[in-house]
């Protein structure tokens, strides 16, 4: 199975002190990125082997203010674009109970087994 998890983590892993794969846990840190591979679909095959995969990654960005969330999103978005991913969607979500500002963004790329990305 083709995946680009290492490439995604390299793009976002040092943007803030709390970058997590999977679920967010608590909100004790002022900024947090939670990410996951949200789709992995065989896009092309030959001789029974996968040659291209369509990969989608979701980044959820949490911060204590809308400005901090926007700034962290802008840096993550730039890094993901440089890594070969195309942003498909980004939206601000309201977290009224916690007071945390949340931006959810989805990125897409086609990849071969060598990690080359295509749009």
For the regions a language model picked out, list residue spans one by one.
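Mid-chain, well-packed structural core segment of small domains
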Residues: 53-85
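Contiguous hydrophobic segments
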Residues: 1-6, 54-57, 118-119
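Small/polar-rich, solvent-exposed N-terminal microdomains that initiate assembly or binding
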Residues: 1-46, 72
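Oligomerization/assembly interface segments of phage tail-like spikes and tubes
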Residues: 51-64, 101-112
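Short, solvent-exposed beta-strand/turn "edge" segments of beta-rich domains on protein surfaces
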Residues: 46-51, 96-98
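Residue-level signal for secondary-structure boundary sites
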Residues: 43, 67-69, 113-115
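Short, surface-exposed, polar/charged, turn-prone segments marking secondary-structure boundaries
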Residues: 47-50, 61-65, 86-90, 115-117
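Acidic-leaning, charged glycine-interspersed low-complexity segments
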Residues: 74-119
């Amino acid at each position: 199975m083709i995946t680009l998890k290492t490439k995604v983590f390299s793009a976002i892993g040092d943007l803030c002190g709390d970058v997590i794969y999977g679920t967010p846990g608590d909100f004790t840190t002022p900024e947090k990125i939670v990410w996951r591979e949200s789709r992995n679909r065989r896009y092309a095959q030959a001789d029974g082997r996968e040659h291209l995969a369509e990969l989608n990654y979701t980044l959820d960005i949490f911060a204590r203010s809308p400005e901090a969330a926007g700034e962290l999103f802008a840096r993550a978005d730039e890094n993901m674009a440089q890594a070969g991913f195309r942003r498909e969607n980004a939206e601000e979500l309201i977290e009224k109970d916690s007071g945390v500002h949340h931006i959810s963004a989805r990125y897409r790329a086609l990849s071969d087994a060598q990690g080359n990305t295509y749009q």
